[in-house]
Amino acid sequence: MRALTAAVLFVAGLTPVLAQDSSPTGPTFPNTVANCNAWYTIVKGDGCDTVEKKFKITPEQFFKWNPDVSTDCVKNFWVGNSYCVGVGKVVSSSKTSTTVKSSSTTQKTSSTSSKLSSSSKPVNTTTTPYSTRNPVTSYNLTQPYTATSLPPAKTQSGQPAYCNQWHWVGTGDTCLTILNLYGSRLTQEQLIIQHSEATALARTSYSVPWTSSQGNATVPAPTDYTPPVKTIVANFTASPQMTGVPQSCQNFYQAQDGDTCDVILKQFDYISREQFFSWNPALQGNCNGLWVGYYYCVANFATGVIPMPPTVTKVPDGAPTAINTCNKWYQAVGNDDCDAITTYFGTFSKSDFIKWNPSVYQDCSGLKTDSWYCVGIPGTPTTRTKPLTTTSLGSLPTQTGISASCKQYWLVSPSDTCASIISNAGVSADDFYKWNPALGGSACKGLQPNYYVCVSLTAAPTDSGSTTTITGPPTKGSNPPTTTTSGGGGGTIQTPSPIMPGMIGGCVRFWFRGKDGASLFCADIAKDAGVSLPDFLKWNPGVGSNCESLWADTWYCVGVSGKPTTMSSGIPTPASK
């Protein structure tokens, strides 16, 4: 018998032997099949596919035997853990631990007809996990938190004390998923107003319907949300902007910190990269060359060729199902409303849109950003039945009460505050709140994203007695509106372009920071110009209090009195020279 065993081992040694073990040598997962009799411990470089190939098993077999591993092999596939690569007879026992004698198991190899025999020793199997990634310790399972009083203990601050219905925020929840769940009785504005920290949704807010055994709480009547009334800025011009932008540009985008052309093209996905660079030639094809605060052209189409909004023909997740014949869907963005969507497409009426999408309600108050809506059924035209009318740059929303003499505006972003606008625009707080009464003073409760606020007036006084007057858009070319300045020392001058955002009104002395001035920073510029550093920073607030945003190829104010001058090369000189 020993001779026969030796012969078998000798023959087996001549063939490739798979690196499998009869028992795991590393930690295992609890749901691995109980009748596993072949194990493999993962090493660096392994993947599910390489293991399947190595042991000549199918993916279905591997994932069936190792159900804790995700089918994309991303979750629970760990180096050092043991996984099942072969099974024997199914073990069936009601006991926690059983001893099973396995019969001789054979496995044929592709290169030889010899057989590999497994050990005939008893194999101890158990239905209880016996290995973990960390030492087993005793722990107590606590019952999940359940609210027993109003309000629940795990809530975020700032929520109404009279609330009597709550939602537990789970993994994957967003404001949109919550609104979709309670959309019949909750609007986006109500959610935001009632949850001052809703933008920081985390798994800390517990929310389930709760009924008091002592009777219903007295709930004040709800206060309807009234959005600010939109008015139109009739004399707005996108400024500052880089040279070469076509005067016929129909729509602009103001670059934010961190923007690249890829960010813009994703937002305005109806234009191509080539179109964007042709409308903004100063970029010279540099996708990362955007200047924060500058306006870039994102639409300059000939009449009648404005592209249709992007749509999909495959039913997206979360799409409405009220119309089972819908064959085209559109995802709402930004400031969309029913009128705007109807106008953009020009292939259906507003009543059609509401009928296809009843979740928006008759007054369109249920329309939600990022949600999908039906925009086509069989028979809907594929091209506009009437041309899309483009609006001038003046169609920009401002809040009520804004100063009628305002000439420079600031588009409020979601991250803006009154303090940040005052700092970046270089205006005084008193003037800012006086020009924008809808903000509610220093409390700044009325500041609304995607609305314009006033940051400069006509004839704004300066210490030198000079005044600034906007003369309107240029008659040719693409520069921003010119500024004619009357200096205290006599003479007039036009503000050059481009300038830093927020430059003081009434500047009469300008210096261009070109290649020959690239080594100069705020303190150097102020010293050469014969002005104090605090004055330079006050006149050019866009550079930042630490001169961290000093731009090349840009004009800077170096004087608000003296003879009007533009210094386009070299270093700045004092007004006395």
Curated annotation (Swiss-Prot):
Residues 96-121, 464-485 have a biased composition (Low complexity). Residues 1-19 form the signal peptide. Keywords: Chitin-binding, Glycoprotein, Repeat, Signal, Virulence. The keyword Transcription does not apply. One of its GO terms (molecular function) is chitin binding. CDD domains: LysM. The keyword Signal applies. Glycans are attached at residues 124, 140, 216, 235. Residues 38-85, 251-298, 328-375, 408-455, 510-558 form the LysM domain. Induction: Expressed constitutively with no significant difference during colonization of banana roots. Residues 96-135, 464-490 are annotated as: Disordered. Residues 122-135 have a biased composition (Polar residues). PANTHER family: AM15, PEPTIDOGLYCAN-BINDING LYSIN DOMAIN. In plants, chitin acts as a microbe-associated molecular pattern (MAMP) that is recognized by lysin motif (LysM)-containing plant cell surface-localized pattern recognition receptors (PRRs) that activate a plethora of downstream immune responses. Belongs to the secreted LysM effector family. The LysM (lysin motif) domains are small globular domains involved in binding chitin in eukaryotes. Lys4 contains 5 LysM domains. Might have a role in sequestration of chitin oligosaccharides (breakdown products of fungal cell walls that are released during invasion and act as triggers of host immunity) to dampen host defense. This is Secreted LysM effector Lys4. It comes from Pochonia chlamydosporia (strain 123).
